[in-house]
């Protein structure tokens, strides 16, 4: 007999405890290497999340791979904008689509991720195809990218943690060619507003960003994407098996720009 579905509501507490468990080792490492960072909350938080994500990033990717891998492999083509690739957890997926992809621009403004991202690009055999753009999504014009020059935009658990996500979505839409595809796998606000989770999610979200590098699990990102422009086809769905007891639900699928 399986566990009650309601226990899924407790999953965020388990994940928060995983993150919290990295606080002691972060303090210890900073005492040895950079004690001054202990005096800055932002510096400490950055180091803390970095230590935690060095483990949990791989776990998160493994858990989502069965969903994300076929989504990417089936829908990317031509010139791709990979928004917020971080240290490159998903870069290897583009290697499997090398026959369809001509260029991938990894839009990653955080220089601390670039070394790891380059290593993963080279390991995936994508050197010369995957190019890092060290700017924010709203500054793509500064590196020469033109409107309607991109065939595919990819956002994989990125819009939950970036500042000004609604503005970023609106600024990216013009770069997509007519008939181009926006591929999505993002945390979103629960649709079960009147159930317990509708109150539980915003409560958890009071502390979630602190423990998860600024990630906001209650953004209506799917709604913002729908409103970003004129779409010919919108095929977004909930994560596999997600329902009224999931505090960290997802929206995944594609949006095709009207021709």
Where do the PLM segments sit?
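A short glycine-rich, Lys/Arg-flanked "PGG" loop and its adjoining helix->strand segment in the class I
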Residues: 166-178
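A short acidic, Gly/Pro-enriched loop at the edge of an enzyme's catalytic core
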Residues: 138-153
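N-terminal auxiliary segments of SAM/dcSAM-dependent transferases
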Residues: 2-39
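Class I SAM-dependent methyltransferase SAM/SAH-binding core
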Residues: 79-141
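Conserved SAM-binding loop and adjacent beta-strand
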Residues: 36-44, 51-68, 85, 217
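C-terminal alpha-helical "lid/dimerization" subdomain adjacent to the S-adenosyl-L-methionine
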Residues: 49-60, 185-249
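Conserved alpha-helix/loop element of class I SAM-dependent methyltransferases that forms part
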Residues: 55-79, 89-97
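A short SAM/SAH-binding and catalytic strip from SAM-dependent methyltransferases
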Residues: 151-165
């Amino acid at each position: 007999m399986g566990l009650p579905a309601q226990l899924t509501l407790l999953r965020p507490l388990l994940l928060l405890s995983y993150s919290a468990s990295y606080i002691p080792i972060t303090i210890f490492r900073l005492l040895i290497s950079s004690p001054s960072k202990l005096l800055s909350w932002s510096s400490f938080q950055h180091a803390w999340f970095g230590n935690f994500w060095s483990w949990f990033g791989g776990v998160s990717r493994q858990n989502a791979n069965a969903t994300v891998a076929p989504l990417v492999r089936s829908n990317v083509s031509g010139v791709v904008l990979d928004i917020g690739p971080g240290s490159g957890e998903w870069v290897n997926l583009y290697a499997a689509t090398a026959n369809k992809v001509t260029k991938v621009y990894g839009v990653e403004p955080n220089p601390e991720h670039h070394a790891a991202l380059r290593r993963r690009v080279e390991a995936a055999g994508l050197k010369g195809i995957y190019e890092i753009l060290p700017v924010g999504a709203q500054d793509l014009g500064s590196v020469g990218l033109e409107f309607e020059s991109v065939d595919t935009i990819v956002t994989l658990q990125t819009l939950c943690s970036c500042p000004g996500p609604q503005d970023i979505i609106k600024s990216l839409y013009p770069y997509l060619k007519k008939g181009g595809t926006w591929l999505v796998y993002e945390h979103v606000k629960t649709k079960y507003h009147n159930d317990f989770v509708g109150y539980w999610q915003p409560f958890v979200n009071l502390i979630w960003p602190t423990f998860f590098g600024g990630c906001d699990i209650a953004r209506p990102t799917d709604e913002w994407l729908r409103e970003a422009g004129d779409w010919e086809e919108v095929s977004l769905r909930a994560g596999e098996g997600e329902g009224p007891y999931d505090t960290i639900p997802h929206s995944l699928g594609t949006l095709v720009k009207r021709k």
